[in-house]
UniProtKB/Swiss-Prot annotation:
Interacts with RAD51 and DMC1. Interacts with DSS1(I). Disruption phenotype: No visible phenotype under normal growth conditions, but the double mutants brca2a and brca2b are sterile due to aberrant chromosome aggregates, chromosomal fragmentation and missegregation during meiosis. Disulfide bonds: none annotated. InterPro entries: BRCA2 (IPR015525), BRCA2_hlx (IPR015252), BRCA2_hlx_sf (IPR036315), BRCA2_OB_1 (IPR015187), BRCA2_OB_2_dom (IPR048262), BRCA2_repeat (IPR002093), NA-bd_OB-fold (IPR012340). This is Protein BREAST CANCER SUSCEPTIBILITY 2 homolog A.
Amino acid sequence: MSTWQLFPDSSGDGFRWEVAGRILQSVSDSTPTKALESTAPLPSMADLLLQGCSKLIAREEAMPGEIPMFRTGLGKSVVLKESSIAKAKSILAEKVTYSDLRNTNCSIPQMRQVDTAETLPMFRTASGKSVPLKESSIAKAMSILGSDKIIDSDNVLPRESGFGVSNSLFQTASNKKVNVSSAGLARAKALLGLEEDDLNGFNHVNQSSSSSQQHGWSGLKTHEEFDATVVKHHSGTPGQYEDYVSGKRSEVLNPSLKVPPTKFQTAGGKSLSVSAEALKRARNLLGDPELGSFFDDVAGGDQFFTPEKDERLSDIAINNGSANRGYIAHEEKTSNKHTPNSFVSPLWSSSKQFSSVNLENLASGGNLIKKFDAAVDETDCALNATHGLSNNRSLASDMAVNNSKVNGFIPRGRQPGRPADQPLVDITNRRDTAYAYNKQDSTQKKRLGKTVSVSPFKRPRISSFKTPSKKHALQASSGLSVVSCDTLTSKKVLSTRYPEKSPRVYIKDFFGMHPTATTRMDYVPDHVRRIKSSNADKYVFCDESSSNKVGAETFLQMLAESGASLQHASRKWVTNHYRWIVWKLACYDIYYPAKCRGNFLTITNVLEELKYRYEREVNHGHCSAIKRILSGDAPASSMMVLCISAINPKTDNDSQEAHCSDSCSNVKVELTDGWYSMNAALDVVLTKQLNAGKLFVGQKLRILGAGLSGWATPTSPLEAVISSTICLLLNINGTYRAHWADRLGFCKEIGVPLALNCIKCNGGPVPKTLAGIKRIYPILYKERLGEKKSIVRSERIESRIIQLHNQRRSALVEGIMCEYQRGINGVHSQNDTDSEEGAKIFKLLETAAEPEFLMAEMSPEQLRSFTTYKAKFEAAQQMRKEKSVAETLEDAGLGERNVTPFMRIRLVGLTSLSYEGEHNPKEGIVTIWDPTERQRTELTEGKIYMMKGLVPINSDSEILYLHARGSSSRWQPLSPKDSENFQPFFNPRKPISLSNLGEIPLSSEFDIAAYVVYVGNAYTDVLQKKQWVFVTDGSAQHSGEISNSLLAISFSTSFMDDSSVSHISHNLVGSVVGFCNLIKRAKDVTNEIWVAEAAENSVYFINAEAAYSSHLKTSSAHIQTWAKLSSSKSVIHELRQRVLSIIGACKSPSC
């Protein structure tokens, strides 16, 4: 928007209008003319009149009748009559009398126009036609402008002085000047709760010359922008004009006390009105401890800081005036009870403008001024440092203590939300690190929930907006306080290596070969070769320039000087990281001497590594593997890569032996993740590996499924390494050798499963293994009988045991109830002490022939006593019953049974198709306790599964035995595509006939469908109950070998099973039964009979339609067909007689 400005004509006879983006400045005779950029809006009528008056007063040749103050665009003079001034005076709501108009030679119509309030012809069109201006239009204009007065401030601002100088005390982030008008200043007064004389900080009034004092005018100036301008008045101005100017001068410079409505302007230029009630609510809602004192009411006696609420005056830089400031103070004294607060710009504080301040009355306003002084001092220091200038000012903190004593406040040295000696935050619309770290003050209420950091101001809608990283020079030139991020927060950036701006190069790519200690170490000094992890923290660097020794303590000081917080970078923290950094760099120099040449272990590299670790751990909150485990944020069973840093033999007098479990071996090792370390206990097998030299210092281990002993609460790794009570429990099944270039810490990739033939039976839990399911056995039930005794039953027998157990319990309980009912009369006679009257009534009704008639004649009190006693009696009786039944059942051995279901699965190891060696897979049996329903139904024979949570059982058998819990183990099937990469392992179930039973090796499992020829009686043999069953399948009739057509099956149970339930009922004779999972035993050559054993996993089915025995369905049908033949009956009879002769029975009822 263009700016119009009045300038004197070159001839000096008049004035002219010009459009200028740069407004010239009035200066004294000794000061050259300067040009200032301005973005001031068009001058108001009050500005024009004030400019015209000042110019008229300055000119000596002005005539009383006409005043050539304005000129047209062509340079023609525009006559300004005194009657026009009177009209303008009436427009501005001034009191105009007829005498005034007469003195201005106004005509009668003009007097009428002035006297008339409805039409005031102030303006004219280009053709000379008058434009009437009504008072309603003026009221609308005043409502739009937000003020009912043209000028409403205690003093005239420089922009309104008529000298064409912009009052640009404030600047935006884009270096654009912000003009402050008198109305805006009045709104600021209303917003900040200031009084009438509180705006003298903006006046910068200088004493004028004697000529200006004669007429009561004073020059207006701003600091370092323009000098004082003296306005002279001609003493020979005739008539009432001099009186008018004198009266207007006082009216313009001393406006009324009415404050206009408060308005704000958005970045787009829109004006927003804010009522006093809204401002009051905002002040109560915000409650900002830093700027809240701006909104406090001075008349209420509130102060910025009180000893109860705030004690931090000592951390505010204060300068209570200086003799070299060059500012002139007002000598006026206010008559108010309280000295009002002075709102001061952060650029130029009032203590730098006034040389004399009454400290006794600055209870609240003085503290605010000192805040701004601190901001200005901080800015001056930053500017002087930028230009290389030295600043010899004294520290303002000393003055802060003195002023706090005068004001009666207690200085406070520390504030939780802000560091000491910190200036006020620069409230500009820039997002830099200084504002980003300006967190919420601790005195405010903390708000829960998600926190979003946004800029408090809108971005200016201009194309020249500069990002915070590109406008450091602009901030310095604007004079705003530049606050560095280290003064606002302890999270100062110490290292620029993180986040990495380019991909990191790891040791495998950098060195390219395995670390090997060469015999030639010309580049490695002796003191470097002697560095170990145990003494690396005591290593010191020798400064060649001096005799100083640089060790961990020196690096602690270096970090503190770099801005690190000693709360985080403590002595223990620095010593710990110094130890691992020195050891790592020394190993590089030792094992890669040709490439390193001793340039890795240097002071610069160590310091940079410490800064890098501080940046990641403190500023970014990253934690290493060991720190996360000790803090409880990650389980110790996670897969990670650690390095052996030391081997510590465990003595017999070790006091920490009790803290480790039985798996703790005679040797402990120290493991590190490069940042922290902790002890680890090895199991027996790992100890053997250590003694064999397969574990050594510097070796990396891939650990999975480790345990944690001695840990109860989150612990710091610096404390855990000292206490030695917490240790990792390592086992060989979860510990593998890692590659020399693997990164330390947690592993992101999935762990490789351990092969079944690599599992050690005493090597601890197996984190993960891959195997195929060869057989799934039926559900079994294990009952614990106490005293470490137990018995295993099949599902069929368990159901019978449950039925028999419940029958026995029911019979026993019925007997107890009958006996209890017979002894009921003697029971209640001894328990009538609770209610004598109720007991008597109860006995009476119990023996009465017609108790209903007796109850009808009872009073309500008697009925109530009877009911109460009866309820108590029945409750006690029920309790006695339950107790008596429980005791009787327990004595009879019929208490609650402790039965746990389980299932067994036979596994087989896998062999890759690419393997060229001998194929000898290892087999194992897994016992799943309390299997889930999904495991019972979804596990399938012949599939490959990824299994987790298996624990091996120590056994000398060639078969590996493992166990797992159904809820904690995981069975994930392998995809068919991946299963094709392994050699076949599964032989499907198929029925075996007696004719080819000789092809099966001994101790092998087989399934058969057979005809039951004879069922023997159960007998006891060596603490076992046995029962023999003889079967045939008819295959001998086709082969003609009658001698090999019998199979004797032995069923056995434990002797502790005192149940009378037999495995095979005699009723099964003559039926076709399917037997699964029978074990082949040696053949009875004497009697020419095949022998098999039914173990715990063996099961039989009468119905061939069962899912488990579906593969026997066809053979069962053939046997039934064969048994119905007439020729087969003689064969069956002959076989039965043969069985009786073998067992020694002459005759059997079942024959």
